[in-house]
Amino acid sequence: MAEGEDVLPLPTSSGDGWEKDLEEALEAGGCDLETLRNIIQGRPLPADLRAKVWKIALNVAGKGDSLASWDGILDLPEQNTIHKDCLQFIDQLSVPEEKAAELLLDIESVITFYCKSRNIKYSTSLSWIHLLKPLVHLQLPRSDLYNCFYAIMNKYIPRDCSQKGRPFHLFRLLIQYHEPELCSYLDTKKITPDSYALNWLGSLFACYCSIEVTQAIWDGYLQQADPFFIYFLMLIILVNAKEVILTQESDSKEEVIQFLENTPSSLNIEDIEDLFSLAQYYCSKTPASFRKDNHHLFGSTLLGIKDDDADLSQALCLAISVSEILQANQLQGEGVRFFVVDCRPAEQYNAGHLSTAFHLDSDLMLQNPSEFAQSVKSLLEAQKQSIESGSIAGGEHLCFMGSGREEEDMYMNMVLAHFLQKNKEYVSIASGGFMALQQHLADINVDGPENGYGHWIASTSGSRSSINSVDGESPNGSSDRGMKSLVNKMTVALKTKSVNVWEKVISFIENTSTPVDRHVSSSDRVGKPYRGVKPVFSIGDEEEYDTDEIDSSSMSDDDRKEVVNIQTWINKPDVKHHFPCKEVKESGHMFPSHLLVTATHMYCLREIVSRKGLAYIQSRQALNSVVKITSKKKHPELITFKYGNSSASGIEILAIERYLIPNAGDATKAIKQQIMKVLDALES
């Protein structure tokens, strides 16, 4: 749980002594939320005191009439829609006729003024009518109705609460973190959270729950005063439906969405205590970075969302700040603790690493799959032992750390994909990698034993001063000095009771071989890792999932891609060469494929695993557009093709494709020979 949060238990209590205390506190005036919490202690609120408690919780008690300066003219272009929706709402309330007209005007005025003051275009899909329902039941005067509505919109309804909006991509990452199996199932059916939870979040459940249940949820939620807590309430509702969803695999996508969307409607008053208790448990098992890195979703901050941070739809998993990683493992007792897995090459790890980090060289995944499998097994055993022994390195939560350089972290992405495919819970990535860790330690000026951070970086090689040369220059002089002072304080890697365990598995994990040449460079990449990555991963066990459902590039193009019979294409008279292979995406995904070479073109046919013998035509490239074919000594089977245009001013790269090809030497030789024939023909 994030630092400084209050856990509100929801006890039940007989007797009304606390209710009298609450009433007296409210009557006395000047009562704050903390005082109310101490009195209420999460118990169900008396109906006659709810309005006063909510106004204090929303910080609008005693606030003036925001509508006083408004002319009251209802003249928005969408006014007819607003009026119609308000009228339908009034009809559902069964309000006495003499009060209906006044209430109708109040609600329509609140919505109209909010639209005008915030420059928002109204639509029925916004769920505002549902959001107003619990407030209307409090029988508030118009000024209080508006102030409460405004406060809820401002503090508790996230920005971009719409189809494909950022709040729902964040919710998917939370589901994946805690319930990877459920997340994977929904992903394979292409069911995104916005398809079923849009109105959960947009109405804070008021759209589906009875007024009594909604009031009970809001009683606890508003006292919690944590806008992110709604995510955990939504998660529990989803988890509660998990068993039903997973046992009804034959249901269509639409049936599953409809079932999920209506799940909150089955909640009863008796369920609310358990709902909050479970939500608080999941909340306590969630890294603080979930909130801190997304705080701008809520509130009136004017700070924009940086482009690099904005695209949560393409995130592989939750990202954890390096400051949280350092702080979390210093905590005693309960709380999120991380088992850090350093996926950098051996020479970088040996030059300097987080002292509590476990080394898993991601190169092994391609270089030596059997050793990689053994390394993973050893890693999980070491994690278990470190937790049992109370080691400072121990933690339930796996956090993978790369270098922080995108082209190198492609390998780490493949390792991450492996763990996510296995439905491993509590999987995250260290934001910014080891470079961010270096920078953070330099920024907090690790200088002197009193700060407690001097032991965090360790070296297992002789060249301690090589950290900066391995992981990039510091952007400024002070950072560089900070790192040098830090390097001078390096100590042994692990101060732990489980040293023997680490020694037993070190032969599998600590690859101290000669430096490996990287075959990827910054000029090689198209797009970025963590981008265009769909959430179901297919590495090694391709038969588990239909690859057309997971590849990022096929998500929008499936309907347009041509489906062909693989054998028919291989047997075509114009096909000169056929190479079975695996297409390797920037994210680390690999897909069973076939490269076919004709006199003038190279085709990639990607197998459709659920339809044996068939494939998509994934790419079609003219041989004369190949400007470069590369491989590296340590990964000779991983071939990179670069396509583009050559001119006097240089080479313009238009596309890059990578393939894992058995007997790659024969394949590249044949392709190069065919390219030369094409070029010779063009010249002549």
Swiss-Prot record:
The keyword Isomerase does not apply. The modification Phosphoserine is found at S300, S469, S474, S507, S556. GO terms for biological process: brain development; embryonic brain development; neuron projection development; retrograde transport, endosome to Golgi; vesicle tethering to Golgi; vesicle-mediated transport. Keywords: Cytoplasmic vesicle, Developmental protein, Golgi apparatus, Phosphoprotein. Residues 459-479 have a biased composition (Polar residues). Residues 514-558 are annotated as: May mediate the interaction with C17orf75, FAM91A1 and WDR11. It is found in: Golgi apparatus, trans-Golgi network; Cytoplasmic vesicle. Residues 459-482 are annotated as: Disordered. The modification Phosphothreonine is found at T514. Residues 514-684 are annotated as: May mediate the interaction with WASHC1. Residues 559-684 are annotated as: May mediate the interaction with FKBP15 and WASHC2. Residues 334-446 form the Rhodanese domain. It holds the Pfam family Rhodanese. Gene3D superfamilies: Rhodanese-like domain, Ypt/Rab-GAP domain of gyp1p, domain 3. Its main location: Golgi. One of its GO terms (cellular component) is cytoplasmic vesicle. Directly interacts with GOLGA1 and GOLGA4. Interacts with FAM91A1, C17ORF75 and WDR11; the interaction recruits TBC1D23 to AP-1-derived vesicles. Directly interacts with WASHC1 and WASHC2A/FAM21A. Interacts with FKBP15. Putative Rab GTPase-activating protein which plays a role in vesicular trafficking. Involved in endosome-to-Golgi trafficking. Acts as a bridging protein by binding simultaneously to golgins, including GOLGA1 and GOLGA4, located at the trans-Golgi, and to the WASH complex, located on endosome-derived vesicles. Together with WDR11 complex facilitates the golgin-mediated capture of vesicles generated using AP-1. Plays a role in brain development, including in cortical neuron positioning. This is TBC1 domain family member 23. It comes from Pongo abelii (Sumatran orangutan). The gene is TBC1D23.
